[in-house]
């Protein structure tokens, strides 16, 4: 019942917000931050408090200012996913769930423009043709999936190599990968275009600005952030940090909060109004402005059949 007054406020504010969106570039930074923080609270109220019991190997992580999931590679598989329609993550999750009943969750993916995705994407060992992708010549971060035919391995890393060259020549030059890779490991999936927060358990978030050339306006530096992190047990965390936390504060939380067990590496992907998490057909993290703006790419989570547990 507590949600209804908040939703009533949304109905009153939406005409003002969307009328003002035409001049958002000239909007006073303090006003923009205040509006964003208001909608952050509203989206939290809209997010479901009744997520069903989750399958083994998937746990909800929730601390003030951050929600997400912790994934155990023994029980789940993750896969980059793309779509070309102008629909959000919830609609795409619904479509996938009609085809594969094992789908459990999804989080928004890499940065995008009207032309396509701004990062490398590989799905099932191939370049998806549903969307265009543009990878920067500047070395950016990625989440990757390798397989030796029997076991899959999740990694975080950095490369400036295009998807086609990655499939042809592999990771060469100045690429980084946070876990050992053998000659038997084949690249199955990749979601790129991100920036560093933590590497080898150290805070390296300034590299995203100084070396990886990310340019966030000051007012957007503490907007929402979509974050992928790995711990010493090779578990993957898919997270959204709410407005108010910049990369420095996110790094501090990941390295200091007991809910995050010895994080070794963390990267960010597209954030702001794109940051969204869907779990079991409900929003664990609802869209910032209550309009699902996740587009083109995402990371989907599927439960494994019990016989597949390794």
Segments predicted by a language model, with ranges:
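Bacterial N-terminal signal peptides
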Residues: 8-16
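Conserved, well-ordered active-site substructure
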Residues: 116-137, 141, 212-268, 274-310
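Flexible, glycine-rich surface segments
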Residues: 173-240
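Bacterial N-terminal signal peptides that target proteins for export
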Residues: 1-8
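Extracytoplasmic
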Residues: 64-66, 100-102, 192, 223-225, ...
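Zymogen propeptides
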Residues: 20-161, 239
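Short acidic-glycine loop/turn motifs at beta-strand connectors
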Residues: 72-73, 145-154, 199-201, 230-234, ...
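Active-site neighborhood of phospho(di)ester-bond hydrolases with catalytic His/Asp-centered motifs
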Residues: 106-109, 266-270
């Amino acid at each position: 019942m507590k949600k209804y007054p908040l939703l009533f406020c949304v109905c009153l504010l939406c005409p003002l917000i969307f009328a003002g969106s035409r001049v958002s570039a000239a909007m006073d930074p303090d006003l923009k931050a205040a509006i964003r923080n208001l909608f952050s609270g509203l989206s939290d109220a809209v997010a479901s408090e009744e997520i069903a019991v989750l399958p083994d190997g998937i746990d909800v992580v929730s601390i003030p200012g951050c929600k997400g999931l912790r994934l155990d590679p023994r029980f789940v598989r993750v896969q980059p996913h793309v779509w070309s329609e102008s629909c959000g993550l919830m609609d795409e999750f619904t479509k996938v769930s009609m085809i594969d009943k094992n789908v459990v969750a999804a989080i928004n993916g890499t940065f995008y423009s009207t032309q396509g995705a701004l990062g490398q994407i590989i799905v099932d060992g191939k370049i998806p043709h549903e969307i265009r992708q543009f990878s920067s010549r500047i070395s950016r971060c990625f989440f990757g999936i390798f397989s030796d035919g029997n076991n899959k391995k999740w990694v975080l890393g950095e490369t400036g190599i295009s998807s086609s060259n990655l499939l042809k020549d592999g990771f060469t030059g100045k690429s980084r990968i946070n876990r050992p890779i053998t000659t038997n490991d084949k690249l199955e999936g990749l979601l790129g275009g991100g920036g560093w927060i933590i590497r080898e358990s150290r805070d390296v978030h300034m590299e995203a600005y100084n070396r990886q050339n990310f340019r966030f306006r000051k007012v957007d530096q503490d907007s929402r952030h979509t974050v992928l992190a790995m711990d010493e047990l090779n578990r993957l965390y898919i997270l959204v940090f709410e407005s108010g936390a910049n990369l420095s504060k996110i790094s501090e939380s990941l390295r200091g909060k007991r809910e995050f067990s010895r994080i070794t590496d963390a990267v960010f992907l597209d954030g702001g109004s794109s940051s969204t998490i869907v779990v079991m057909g409900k929003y664990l993290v609802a869209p910032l402005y209550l309009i699902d703006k996740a587009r083109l790419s995402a990371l989907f989570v599927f439960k494994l059949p019990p016989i597949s547990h390794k």
